[in-house]
Amino acid sequence: MTTTAASGKRLALVDCNNFFCSCERVFDPSLIGVPVVVLSNNDGCIISRSEEAKALGIPMGAPLHQQQEVIRRHGVRVFSSNYTLYGDMSARVMSILRDAVPAIEVYSIDEAFLELPPAFEEENARELRGKILQWTGIPVCIGIARTKLLAKFANRHAKKNKQMTGGVFDFSTYWDPESLMVDAPCDALWGVAKNTARDLSKIGIRTVLEFQHADPTAVRRSLGVVGERLHRELNGISCLELEEMPPPRKGVMASRSFGSPIEKIEDLEEALANHVARASAKVRRFGLLATHLEIFLQTNRFRKEDPQYHPSIGMTLPTPNASTSELIATARELLQSIYRPGYRYKKIGVMLAHLVSEEEYQPSLFTAPVKGKIDIDKIVDEINRRLGDPKNPLVTRASMGTANSGTKWRMKAERHSPNYTTNWNELPVVTG
């Protein structure tokens, strides 16, 4: 179901501030006011920074090893990414938003577009921001406008000027909107990448205001239909619909780099089984079935001294499937066909693709029955959702190993915070 922001309607973009760092701070007050960074998979690069860390000049995406001196000198607190915690905190924020407005599009783990009711004023947005902070501990900024593009731009202004805006800015009622556009570069706009900005500069468009006033024909000639749509959005004409339900997925991938290089096929099989289990659970959650399965292996491209090998292989499944056990068996057969000894493998992954709706699929009398196995898997999914830890599910298959096995292939997460909200054994303890 989609909702178009028709004339007269307004949208809001709610964006959680420095989301991963904010989640860590909710349960550890000692982090408030000190620089905090969160790392990517395998503790490789910095993917979230508190305002204090940004002030130290720590760049987004910087490899951790390049920032060790700054971290040591300024006492920066460093955390491995805890996606279990972040996903749960995101769900709590989105639940509050759903109760506040007629329609919501969850755009990412830390962003959502809202369709606002007619009587929704800037003061209501401030109350909503306060409620989210009080109920979850997560600070957000809210930008309000007539279109998605302008709501994003309004949110940018709210965030960059928090002392003046208080984290909320309504572009649709601002008395001098052009003053915000006159010095803003085109790549400050949502959907305008660096190369798009370069194309615009070739036709004399360098600022957001110049883009807004540009000749639509020239924009379309330079950037095509996508550029024309952005231009219309910038002029308050809604072209991008609010998607209350995400479009059907074309595929689900699960892959991770290993904590240490892997050479034995037994370790690769265990890692692959875990990835297939995660991907198939996600496919089932969306009520879908996979008709194609593909796996790939990679050595470390950056270790030039190591022999390189990056094979992949796929196959169309005999029948659409979401059974973990059957998909693991198929994936292991494919792995056997591409595995070569003598290589130091860095990554393995699986893609479940060409997805079809479980409700629409009519199994042939001549295909192997899979519905019973999928139904059992769904029961396991529910048990793991209620009682397990997403990183270490309560119910697994023998081929997936245990939490204590696979120490080589499991990701590095040496600075991992507890799963405060999803694991009974890791609940925060309050002492008097």
Task: State the predicted function of each range.
Residues 121-123, 161, 304, 356-362:
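Short, charged/polar, Gly/Pro-enriched secondary-structure boundary elements
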Residues 326, 332-395:
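C-terminal hydrophobic structural anchor segments
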Residues 4, 188, 196-345, 360-362, ...:
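DNA-contacting surface of Y-family translesion DNA polymerases
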Residues 113, 316, 349:
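Short aromatic/hydrophobic contact patches that present stacked aromatics
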Residues 115-117, 298, 318, 353:
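Solvent-exposed residues in well-ordered beta-strands and their adjoining turns
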Residues 145-147, 298, 351-355, 400:
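Short loop/turn motifs enriched for small/polar and acidic residues
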